[in-house]
Every structure is written in C-alpha cells, then in structure tokens.
C-alpha cells in the first residue's frame, strides 16, 4: 500500500516474475488500468506478443492469466472471477498453484455503488468485508493446509488516503481505501512512501543537458508480518527493471548490467547521477550516490 508512484506496482510485478520462475500461475487482476506490458517485460515477465496480419499487437500469451476493467467493474465481479478460478483449480482444470495479483483495491466500487450511481466508501468497505474478509481470504488461507493439493496466494495493492489528525496534537494516519478487511486478514503488509506524501526522491541520469530518470529512492516499512515476525523500515531503490538495495555497489552493478539500456536512452555510458527530492523525516540511510 502507499501513495502513487512509490514502488507498489514494481513489487507486484516482481512477485509475478518470481511466481513464473517457481511454476506458479500468475493471475493478474488489473482494475487500476495503468498496466504496461513493456514495463512487465523489462522486469522479466515471460510472455509472447500475438500480432495481426498487419503486425499490430492484439493480445499476449504465456504462463499467466489476465483480466481488467473490460470484464471486472465491481468488487463483486473481482470476487466472482477469483472464486471461479479457484473452483476450476479444484476440478483439475487449472493444475497449478496460483498467485492472484490485484492492482488495485480501491480502484473499483461495489455493485451497490454502481447501481446507485454513488461511489459510497462505506458500501465499498462493506462489500470488501463480505466478499473477501468472510469468503475469499479464508479460501486462500485454507489452500495452505498440508492436505490441499494446491496453494494459492493473493498479492494486492491497496490505494490509500490520509486521515487528518483527530486533535491538535495528533498525527495524520494512513488509511486503506475499501476498509480494513484486507489488513486484518493479511499475513504481510508493506507500506511504500510516507503518510502525507510519496516519500520518494528521483535519481536522474544527466549527460550534456539531457536528463533521464534513472531510478527512484523510496521509504519502505514492514507494518505487519505474520510470516517471520520481523517488522522493520528502511529505503530501497526502484528502477524500471526492479528493486535494488540502497547502496552504491548495488546501483553501480545495476548500471553496468543494463549498460545497453542506458546507452540507448542517454547516448553514453559516461553520465552523472543526480538525486532530487525530499524523502521527508524518515530515518536517513547512507546515500547511494556517495
């Protein structure tokens, strides 16, 4: 969860890439409609482009399933889609472990909101609680029992909003759109960025006046962890190819590994890196550009 452009989609695609490597079937549910196949390909997602007679890309195929707002326009439709796939899996028609990847909770309303032509947050939260908290989340947890033939996982991006302080000496709080049902059922919650702002800084590659975004540095915090029990906070560097540790050796290694990519964008491998922006008041870690 987190504000816009803080690394959430990067984390989701990394999960999908690793799922493919493990033989797990990624199931994309894209209701945010900011999906980029090119970005996914850069990060290592495996798929084939399907072209028409004129050479135009009309579809994509591979070891994954994909659905978006073309068919999923409400919380209930997302839930039915997931439930149908789990049923097909139980019948043996989808003989894979599945990793559902939803981008994002808070981007679609509930059926009642649509029928009433009002995007009511309380109705949406109620639908999330009914469809997921009391139903699908439990099915996913039950798939982790030893006697279950398949194991399913849900990785979801949750849109957020900032609640103002309740009193003059209070602090603003980050709240999930769609209510707290997913928070309560989650085994791992990661927050990217800060409470009141994105909490990122841009790292630009500069050569002869040309500026290209090289990466972003973002705050990250493990707010809930029922897997290893460890909660921590720090910073990571996100690039178009995935995450990097926040240190100079890692970014130098990345720069060298993708030199053809940067040569194409910048026109040279001899460029300067300049960091711009303010990560706010979170703990300072060594600057990766030092």
What function would you assign to each model-found segment?
Residues 18-22, 47, 85-95, 140-150, ...:
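Conserved catalytic network of the ASCE P-loop NTPase/AAA+ motor domain
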Residues 125-243:
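Phosphate-binding/switch region of NTP-binding enzymes
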Residues 1-2, 29-32, 157-159, 192:
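Short His-Asn-centered micro-motif
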Residues 51-62, 202-206, 249, 253:
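Surface-exposed intrinsically disordered loops and tails
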Residues 24-124, 128-131, 277, 282:
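Conserved inter-motif catalytic segment of the P-loop NTP-binding fold
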Residues 233-290:
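NTP-binding/hydrolysis catalytic cores, primarily Walker-type P-loop NTPases
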Residues 15, 39-42, 78-81, 85, ...:
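Alpha-helical scaffold elements adjacent to nucleotide-binding pockets in ATP/GTP-utilizing enzyme cores
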Residues 1-23:
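Glycine-rich P-loop/Walker A and Walker A-like loops and their local beta1-loop-alpha1 context
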């Amino acid at each position: 969860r987190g504000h816009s452009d803080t690394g959430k989609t990067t984390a989701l695609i990394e999960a999908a890439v690793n799922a493919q490597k493990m033989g797990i079937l990624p199931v994309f549910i894209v209701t945010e409609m900011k999906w980029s196949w090119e970005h996914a390909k850069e990060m290592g997602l495996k798929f084939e482009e399907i072209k028409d007679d004129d050479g135009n890309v009309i579809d994509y195929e591979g070891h994954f399933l994909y659905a978006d707002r073309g068919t999923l326009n409400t919380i209930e439709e997302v839930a039915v889609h997931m439930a149908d796939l789990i049923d097909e899996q139980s019948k043996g028609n989808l003989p894979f472990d599945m990793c559902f990847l939803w981008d994002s909770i808070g981007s679609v309303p509930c059926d009642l909101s649509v029928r009433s032509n009002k995007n009511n947050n309380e109705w949406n939260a109620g639908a999330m609680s009914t469809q997921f908290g009391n139903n699908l989340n439990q099915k996913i947890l039950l798939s982790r029992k030893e006697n279950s033939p398949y194991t399913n996982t849900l990785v979801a991006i949750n849109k957020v909003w900032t609640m103002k302080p309740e009193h003059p000496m209070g602090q603003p709080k980050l709240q999930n759109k769609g209510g707290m049902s997913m928070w309560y059922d989650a085994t791992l919650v990661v927050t990217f960025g800060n409470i009141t702002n994105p909490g990122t800084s841009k790292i630009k590659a500069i050569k002869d006046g040309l500026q290209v975004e090289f990466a972003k540095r973002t705050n990250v915090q493990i707010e809930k962890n029922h897997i290893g029990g460890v909660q921590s906070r720090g910073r990571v560097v996100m690039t178009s190819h995935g995450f990097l540790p926040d240190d100079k050796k890692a970014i130098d290694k990345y720069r060298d590994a993708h030199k053809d990519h940067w040569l194409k964008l910048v026109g040279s491998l001899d460029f300067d890196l300049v960091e711009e922006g303010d990560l706010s008041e979170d703990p300072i870690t060594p600057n990766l550009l030092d």
